[in-house]
């Protein structure tokens, strides 16, 4: 952990401990945390689109893990608000398991368009939900090609929790790494965000309240981080 300007920055290991405290000790379900994370992502997407998503095109890049599940929740909410949503399944639907797979079933039942990688994206906003804080090393295929395509598209990118390809603990960008205009990070920021090399990948950083218990914030000496709102701009 590092402490900067009244805010705790956690390593990937410490963030995992915070999640385990919420899930294993206090009984908050993975599904609840995923719902909250995706909802906050969708709320920030709406803000970035001028406060109105109806008729606007949003493409969500979805990986196999819980980060992808967060993206699927965000896709559902933007769709419900009238957005024109496309979900790109980076590794196919069969790669998703457990909570993300359940989210995908709901998305498909709602009639949200799901596609395989490839082709040209036409969107006002891309949502990067490919890799989460547990990822290490440079992304491999097929994710690497998706990341390069996203960066090359010139469509503004909102990263879910952290830009895919960025090491949460060290802040070392992989090859490739998403170049986001905005990042919605969940709970507390990661130590890697303090690395100057990481900051061009992160863009504007927002902290999103996903209902991690108060004990998490008290443990890291910043209990009031969301006292004035559930989406807080850090820089």
How should each PLM-predicted stretch be described?
Residues 2-10, 125-235:
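YjeF_N-associated NAD(P)HX repair module
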Residues 43-130, 138-160:
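Nucleotide and nucleotide-moiety/phosphate-recognizing core
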Residues 8-15, 27-38, 71, 96-103, ...:
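Generic structural signal for well-ordered, non-membrane alpha-helical segments
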Residues 4, 15-19, 23, 27, ...:
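Generic, low-specificity signal for short hydrophobic/alpha-helical stretches with a mild N-terminal bias
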Residues 1-56, 214-235:
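Positively charged, low-complexity intrinsically disordered leader regions
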């Amino acid at each position: 952990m590092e402490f900067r300007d009244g805010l705790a920055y956690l390593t990937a290991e410490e963030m995992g401990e915070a999640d385990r405290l919420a899930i294993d000790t206090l009984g908050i379900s993975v599904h609840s945390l995923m719902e909250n994370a995706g909802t906050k992502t969708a709320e920030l997407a709406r803000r970035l689109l001028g406060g109105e998503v109806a008729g606007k095109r949003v493409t969500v890049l979805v990986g196999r893990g819980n980060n992808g599940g967060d993206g699927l929740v965000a896709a559902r909410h933007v769709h419900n608000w009238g957005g024109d949503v496309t979900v790109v399944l980076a590794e196919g639907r069969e790669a998703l398991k457990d909570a993300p797979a359940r989210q995908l079933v709901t998305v498909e039942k709602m009639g949200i368009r799901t596609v395989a990688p490839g082709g040209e994206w036409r969107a006002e906003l891309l949502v990067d939900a490919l890799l989460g804080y547990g990822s290490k090393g440079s992304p491999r295929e097929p994710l690497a090609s998706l990341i390069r395509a996203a960066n090359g598209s010139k469509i503004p990118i909102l990263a879910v929790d952290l830009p895919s390809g960025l090491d949460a603990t060290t802040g070392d960008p992989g090859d490739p790494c998403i170049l986001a205009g905005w990042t919605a990070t969940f709970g507390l920021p990661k130590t890697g965000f303090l690395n100057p090399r990481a900051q061009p990948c992160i863009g504007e950083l927002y902290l999103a309240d996903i209902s991690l218990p108060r004990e998490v914030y008290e443990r890291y000496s910043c209990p009031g981080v969301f006292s004035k709102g559930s989406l807080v701009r850090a820089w």
